[in-house]
Protein backbone atom coordinates (compact mmCIF):
# COMPACT_ATOMS: atom_id res chain seq x y z
CA UNK A 1 0.00 0.00 0.00
CA UNK A 2 1.27 3.47 -0.83
CA UNK A 3 1.90 5.62 2.19
CA UNK A 4 -0.55 8.49 1.94
CA UNK A 5 -2.25 10.84 4.33
CA UNK A 6 -5.87 11.83 3.94
CA UNK A 7 -7.38 15.30 4.33
CA UNK A 8 -10.85 14.59 5.71
CA UNK A 9 -11.83 18.09 6.85
CA UNK A 10 -14.61 18.41 4.24
CA UNK A 11 -16.45 15.32 5.51
CA UNK A 12 -18.88 15.13 8.44
CA UNK A 13 -16.85 14.05 11.48
CA UNK A 14 -18.42 10.61 11.97
CA UNK A 15 -17.87 9.75 8.31
CA UNK A 16 -14.32 11.12 8.43
CA UNK A 17 -13.48 8.89 11.39
CA UNK A 18 -14.90 5.82 9.62
CA UNK A 19 -12.62 6.52 6.66
CA UNK A 20 -9.68 7.26 8.91
CA UNK A 21 -10.22 4.03 10.85
CA UNK A 22 -10.07 1.99 7.65
CA UNK A 23 -6.93 3.83 6.57
CA UNK A 24 -5.21 3.35 9.95
CA UNK A 25 -6.13 -0.35 10.06
CA UNK A 26 -4.82 -0.91 6.51
CA UNK A 27 -1.63 1.06 7.16
CA UNK A 28 -0.87 -0.79 10.40
CA UNK A 29 -1.71 -4.25 9.05
CA UNK A 30 1.04 -6.63 10.17
CA UNK A 31 2.60 -4.08 12.55
CA UNK A 32 3.03 -5.03 16.20
CA UNK A 33 5.24 -2.18 17.39
CA UNK A 34 3.57 0.38 19.70
CA UNK A 35 5.91 3.27 18.82
CA UNK A 36 5.43 2.72 15.08
CA UNK A 37 1.66 2.71 15.63
CA UNK A 38 1.81 5.89 17.73
CA UNK A 39 3.87 7.69 15.08
CA UNK A 40 1.56 6.54 12.31
CA UNK A 41 -1.65 7.44 14.13
CA UNK A 42 -0.27 10.86 15.11
CA UNK A 43 0.53 11.61 11.48
CA UNK A 44 -2.73 10.34 10.04
CA UNK A 45 -4.99 12.04 12.61
CA UNK A 46 -3.02 15.29 12.42
CA UNK A 47 -3.19 15.57 8.65
CA UNK A 48 -6.76 14.28 8.38
CA UNK A 49 -8.10 17.19 10.42
CA UNK A 50 -5.37 19.85 10.37
CA UNK A 51 -5.00 20.05 14.14
CA UNK A 52 -2.46 22.22 15.95
CA UNK A 53 -0.85 19.29 17.83
CA UNK A 54 -1.51 15.56 17.73
CA UNK A 55 0.49 13.00 19.66
CA UNK A 56 1.07 10.62 22.49
CA UNK A 57 2.34 10.99 26.02
CA UNK A 58 3.67 7.62 27.18
CA UNK A 59 3.43 6.32 30.73
CA UNK A 60 7.02 6.04 31.94
CA UNK A 61 6.25 5.80 35.67
CA UNK A 62 2.79 4.27 36.22
CA UNK A 63 0.57 6.51 38.29
CA UNK A 64 3.17 9.27 38.27
CA UNK A 65 4.73 10.44 35.01
CA UNK A 66 3.99 10.84 31.29
CA UNK A 67 6.72 11.59 28.75
CA UNK A 68 6.22 12.88 25.22
CA UNK A 69 6.15 10.22 22.53
CA UNK A 70 5.57 10.39 18.79
CA UNK A 71 3.72 13.52 17.70
CA UNK A 72 3.02 16.03 14.93
CA UNK A 73 3.09 19.77 15.59
CA UNK A 74 5.14 22.27 17.53
CA UNK A 75 7.42 21.31 20.41
CA UNK A 76 5.41 19.51 23.07
CA UNK A 77 5.84 19.51 26.82
CA UNK A 78 8.45 16.87 27.57
CA UNK A 79 7.00 15.53 30.82
CA UNK A 80 3.62 15.78 32.53
CA UNK A 81 2.79 14.41 35.96
CA UNK A 82 -0.39 12.42 36.53
CA UNK A 83 -3.21 14.68 37.69
CA UNK A 84 -1.71 17.84 36.14
CA UNK A 85 -3.29 19.49 33.10
CA UNK A 86 -5.63 17.79 30.66
CA UNK A 87 -3.22 14.93 29.84
CA UNK A 88 -2.36 14.25 33.47
CA UNK A 89 -6.03 14.32 34.43
CA UNK A 90 -7.00 11.88 31.67
CA UNK A 91 -4.17 9.56 32.78
CA UNK A 92 -4.93 9.79 36.51
CA UNK A 93 -8.67 9.30 36.04
CA UNK A 94 -8.28 6.85 33.12
CA UNK A 95 -10.97 8.57 31.08
CA UNK A 96 -11.30 10.70 27.97
CA UNK A 97 -11.24 14.42 28.76
CA UNK A 98 -12.75 16.84 26.25
CA UNK A 99 -12.14 20.55 26.89
CA UNK A 100 -13.98 23.11 24.76
CA UNK A 101 -11.97 26.06 26.14
CA UNK A 102 -8.59 25.27 27.70
CA UNK A 103 -8.61 28.63 29.54
CA UNK A 104 -11.44 27.28 31.72
CA UNK A 105 -9.67 24.01 32.62
CA UNK A 106 -8.08 24.23 36.09
CA UNK A 107 -4.33 23.67 35.87
CA UNK A 108 -4.19 23.63 32.06
CA UNK A 109 -0.59 23.36 30.83
CA UNK A 110 0.01 25.66 27.86
CA UNK A 111 2.66 23.83 25.85
CA UNK A 112 1.62 26.00 22.88
CA UNK A 113 -0.17 29.26 23.66
CA UNK A 114 -2.26 28.97 20.49
CA UNK A 115 -4.14 25.94 21.82
CA UNK A 116 -7.81 26.75 22.50
CA UNK A 117 -9.44 23.33 22.85
CA UNK A 118 -8.20 19.83 23.55
CA UNK A 119 -9.20 16.19 23.75
CA UNK A 120 -7.15 13.53 25.53
CA UNK A 121 -7.90 9.80 25.23
CA UNK A 122 -6.39 7.03 27.40
CA UNK A 123 -4.56 4.27 25.50
CA UNK A 124 -4.48 0.76 26.98
CA UNK A 125 -2.40 -2.36 26.42
CA UNK A 126 -4.07 -5.75 25.85
CA UNK A 127 -3.78 -6.45 29.61
CA UNK A 128 -5.78 -3.26 30.32
CA UNK A 129 -2.89 -1.28 31.79
CA UNK A 130 -2.43 2.34 30.75
CA UNK A 131 0.18 2.67 28.00
CA UNK A 132 -0.22 6.33 27.05
CA UNK A 133 -2.68 9.10 26.31
CA UNK A 134 -3.46 10.50 22.87
CA UNK A 135 -3.54 14.31 23.02
CA UNK A 136 -5.07 16.44 20.27
CA UNK A 137 -5.05 20.26 20.43
CA UNK A 138 -6.81 22.80 18.22
CA UNK A 139 -6.44 26.53 17.66
CA UNK A 140 -10.26 26.78 17.61
CA UNK A 141 -12.60 26.86 20.59
CA UNK A 142 -14.91 23.84 20.91
CA UNK A 143 -13.18 22.04 18.05
CA UNK A 144 -13.99 18.59 19.45
CA UNK A 145 -17.25 16.81 20.16
CA UNK A 146 -18.74 13.38 20.68
CA UNK A 147 -17.84 12.22 17.17
CA UNK A 148 -14.20 12.97 17.98
CA UNK A 149 -14.42 11.18 21.32
CA UNK A 150 -15.95 8.09 19.74
CA UNK A 151 -13.65 8.14 16.70
CA UNK A 152 -10.44 8.59 18.67
CA UNK A 153 -11.43 5.97 21.26
CA UNK A 154 -12.02 3.50 18.41
CA UNK A 155 -8.66 4.37 16.81
CA UNK A 156 -6.64 3.81 19.99
CA UNK A 157 -8.43 0.48 20.57
CA UNK A 158 -5.73 -0.82 18.17
CA UNK A 159 -3.34 -0.93 21.15
CA UNK A 160 -5.71 -3.18 23.15
CA UNK A 161 -5.64 -5.90 20.55
CA UNK A 162 -3.08 -8.60 21.29
CA UNK A 163 -0.56 -9.17 18.50
Language-model features: locations:
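A generic structural motif
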Residues: 140-142
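Well-ordered alpha/beta subsegment
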Residues: 128, 144-146, 151, 161
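Sensory-domain boundary capping and coupling elements
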Residues: 124-138
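A generic structural signal for residues located within well-ordered alpha-helices
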Residues: 33-36, 82, 115, 147
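Intrinsically disordered, low-complexity terminal regulatory regions
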Residues: 1-75, 154-163
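Regulatory sensory and allosteric helical modules in signal-transduction proteins
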Residues: 59, 64-113
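Short hydrophobic/aromatic beta-strand element in the GNAT-like acyltransferase core
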Residues: 53, 120, 133
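A short, aliphatic-rich beta-strand micro-motif
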Residues: 117-125
Amino acid sequence: MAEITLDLRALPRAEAYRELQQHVDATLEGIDDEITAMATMSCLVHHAFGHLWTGFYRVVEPGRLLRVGPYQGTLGCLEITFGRGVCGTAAAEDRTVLVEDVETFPGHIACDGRSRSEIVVPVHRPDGSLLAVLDVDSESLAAFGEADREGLERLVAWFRRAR
